[in-house]
Design a protein with these regions (language model features):
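Residue-level signal for helical boundary/lining positions with a hydrophobic bias
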Residues: 126, 479-480
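Flexible, glycine/threonine-enriched loop-and-boundary segments that flank and lead into catalytic domains
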Residues: 108, 447-478
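N-terminal non-catalytic structural scaffold regions of very large proteins
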Residues: 1-449, 494-507
Length: 507
């Protein structure tokens, strides 16, 4: 009989030594949902608060404190009971609501029930109507700025600022045969305007002295500048006559900015009444207003990395003319609009140089693609519901008797709950959990999808997006992807990959 060793010690005779211990493979799901409960819920309520009526006299503030245990009751049923009863494993959420009447100074406070929010089980899944579901992480293009060769043969280069929410801004350089170079811009993918029109719209400090320095630096734009400046002069003179403006240098610069606003507004909103105020509000609101434009934290981080040095270089070249980026604000700064234009023009000028600091971006590199995990996806659904609720609150403020208004009577939670239910029941990213075996369930929770709202569609996705990229190494498995129309659009996180605070995959 052979005697077996009773020692529990394992010996490893491999030449390579022990493998690195595996991390928690469910952390992509658990960490993201925990962050949503601690931070995302509060941010969503802060984004719509305060809600004011059309006169600005009445306002409603909503405040959620994740550390206040009175605002979060424990779940009614356990996971097992939810499965048996075919109900949703959820937790009641409350908010502190404060109604303020600025005319009388009256304040009414209440704790208001906002609905039952589905919560994640220990296994990283959700129980929705008794069935186990997984929310798949989405792989999307990161907000920020990208410089690429033009898609059209006459466009040499183009640079696009993609915000988290708001209008795109695109600058490009056209080079046609036997014609001088022409730089332009597009706002919200509308008709093209000259780059000089965009710069004039930024600030009244954009005077002839600035443009002379600008053209001296980018001499290949000299012909375009002289043509555009002559045309602009005629427009400015007409504008000053129309509004009876005195012919002074200050008025000339003011008229220069106003005519640029009007030209942009004409392209963006053809058919609408062209007034200076409407044009100003459109341009300022499109990129510099927090209500209509949001770069997001990721976009601000990417812009600081890509354009930070260019903004500093422009201050040296042209002087400190424009307002600089504020790290706290997730809107564009005027200095960054100028930096996007100069980066593109420097890229065109240095294209044949052996050494340059200007480089084309690869949109398929994982530095330019990020993960929207479960917490962020639920937060987006919640924001949609809250913005619908905001409209209801405004209407009720105008129709109800001011004396009898209380926070409870203003708030209708139905739009919020229907947005959350709609996400879990019908979203392309909320799926029945694969329960063939424990391993298929685990890989399902680590799945990455480029499809879904805000992502790609099977029909439009080209070969480059689907292909294996060198930046996938150690981040996403290059082998495991379905056959058929989804090939390359569905992937799986590698063993040692993790998601950083900005949603980028690290290894």
């Amino acid at each position: 009989l052979t005697s077996r060793s009773l020692s529990p010690v394992r010996f490893n005779f491999s030449a390579l030594g022990e493998a690195y211990p595996l991390p928690n493979l469910l952390e992509i799901q658990r960490d993201s949902f925990d962050l949503f409960m601690k931070q995302g819920l509060r941010e969503a309520f802060e984004a719509i608060s305060p809600i004011s009526d059309f006169t600005g006299r009445l306002s409603l503030e909503l405040e959620f404190d994740p550390d206040d245990m009175d605002l979060k009751s424990p779940p009614k049923f356990t996971v097992e009971e939810c499965r048996q009863r075919a109900t949703t494993y959820s937790q009641p959420i409350f908010v502190h609501a404060r109604f303020l009447n600025s005319e009388t100074g009256e304040i009414k406070e209440q704790t208001v029930f906002m609905g039952d929010f589905p919560i994640m089980t220990e296994q990283g899944t959700f129980i929705i109507n008794g069935t186990e579901r997984v929310v798949v992480s989405q792989l999307v293009r990161s907000p920020g700025v990208l410089f690429q060769p033009g898609k059209d043969e006459k466009v040499a280069f183009e640079g696009t600022i993609h915000p988290g929410r708001g209008e795109w801004l695109q600058v490009d350089l056209e080079e046609k045969k036997n014609k001088s170079a022409n730089a332009g811009a597009r706002i919200a993918r509308k008709r093209r305007i000259s780059i000089f029109t965009l710069l004039r719209a930024l600030d009244t400090s954009m005077d002839e002295a600035f443009f002379n320095k600008f053209v001296e630096h980018f001499d290949f734009l000299e012909d375009q500048f002289h043509t555009d400046w002559k045309k602009a002069h005629t427009e400015i003179a007409k504008h000053m006559d129309k509004y009876n403006m005195e012919d002074t240098p200050e008025n000339f610069l003011k008229a220069s900015q106003e005519t640029a606003w009007l030209e942009i507004y004409r392209r963006a909103r053809p058919g609408e009444v062209q007034t200076i105020e409407a044009a100003r509000q459109y341009f300022e609101g499109a990129f510099f207003s927090e209500k209509r434009y949001d770069l997001s934290r990721v976009g601000r981080y990417k812009l600081d990395i890509k354009l930070g040095a260019e903004v500093a270089k422009n201050v040296e070249l042209f002087g400190d003319l424009l307002e600089k980026p504020n790290p706290e604000l997730h809107v564009l700064s005027k200095a960054e609009v100028l930096a996007t234009a100069t980066y593109l023009l420097n890229l065109a000028r240095d294209r044949t140089a052996k050494e340059t600091t200007y480089h084309i971006d690869d949109q398929d590199h994982f530095a330019n693609r990020r993960i929207r995990s479960v917490g962020e996806l639920i937060q987006n659904a919640l924001r949609t519901g809250l913005s619908r609720m905001e409209r209801v609150v405004r209407e009720r403020m105008n129709t109800q008797d001011v004396e009898s208004i209380a926070p409870q009577t203003l708030i209708n939670i139905r739009p919020v709950m229907s947005a959350i239910k709609e996400f879990f029941a019908t979203s392309q990213l909320s799926q029945f959990m694969d329960q063939n075996n424990p391993l298929s369930g685990l890989t399902h929770k680590r799945r990455l999808s480029a499809l879904g709202p805000g992502g790609l569609s099977r029909e439009r996705a080209g070969l480059e997006v689907r292909d294996v990229h060198s930046s996938h190494y150690g981040r996403m498995c290059p082998i495991e992807t379905p056959e058929g129309p989804n090939v390359g659009l569905i992937g799986y996180l590698a063993n040692y990959a993790r998601i950083n605070e900005y949603g980028f995959i690290e290894t």
